């Protein structure tokens, strides 16, 4: 699957699926069962839209990103097409919660019987935005680059990881 939000605030586009509530887990369980009945496998792609979003597509929730920079272009909503709003820059102490959203969604995927999880890290969505000097103007960018190259980001996102210290490492 593609473009599945790990939290309500992670939704970007209209009518995209999530995998973070019990009802969503049950829905994905039905999908996984149908795929497995045909001897197939299914992997969910977790995508937190970050700044590539509009509040109208997520019940008024504000968009968040590493820095307060609007994405270029427009977002289609049920009310029409609008420029992307400027997202709220997350505070350093919120980063661990964003990581935990991905971990929770991965656990939900396991509970739903899905065969794997992929984290979407491109197109200036949240993960990509944190890793790019064009969209992350925060002072700790060098720390994130080091974490990426050492594999620590993947370790922090892994369910059951004992090495999820994003708040400590980025603070």
Q: Can you say where each PLM-predicted feature lies in the sequence?
A:
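The substrate-binding groove and active-site-proximal loops of carbohydrate-active enzymes
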Residues: 14-22, 87-96, 144-147
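Short, well-ordered coil/turn segments that N-cap beta-strands
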Residues: 33-42, 113-115, 165-169
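Non-globular sequence segments
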Residues: 41, 47-108, 112
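N-terminal capping/small domains of soluble enzymes
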Residues: 1-49, 98, 106
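Hydrophobic faces of well-ordered beta-strands that scaffold small-molecule active sites
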Residues: 1, 42-44, 117-119, 170-171
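Short glycine/proline- and charge-enriched loop/turn segments
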Residues: 12-16, 132-142
């Amino acid at each position: 699957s593609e473009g599945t939000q790990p939290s309500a605030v992670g939704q970007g586009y209209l009518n995209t699926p999530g995998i973070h509530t019990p009802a969503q887990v049950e829905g994905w369980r039905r999908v996984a069962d149908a795929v497995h009945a045909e001897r197939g496998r299914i992997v969910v792609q977790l995508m937190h839209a970050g700044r590539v979003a509009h509040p109208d597509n997520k019940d008024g929730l504000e968009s968040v990103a590493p820095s307060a920079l609007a994405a270029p272009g427009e977002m289609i909503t049920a009310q029409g097409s609008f420029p992307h709003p400027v997202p709220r820059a997350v505070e350093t102490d919120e980063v661990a919660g964003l990581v935990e959203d991905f971990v929770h969604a991965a656990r939900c995927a396991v509970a739903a019987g899905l065969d794997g999880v992929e984290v979407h890290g491109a197109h200036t969505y949240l993960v990509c935005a944190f890793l790019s000097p064009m969209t992350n103007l925060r002072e700790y960018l060098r720390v994130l680059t080091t974490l990426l190259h050492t594999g620590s980001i993947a370790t922090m996102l892994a369910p059951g990881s004992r090495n999820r210290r994003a708040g400590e490492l980025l603070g």
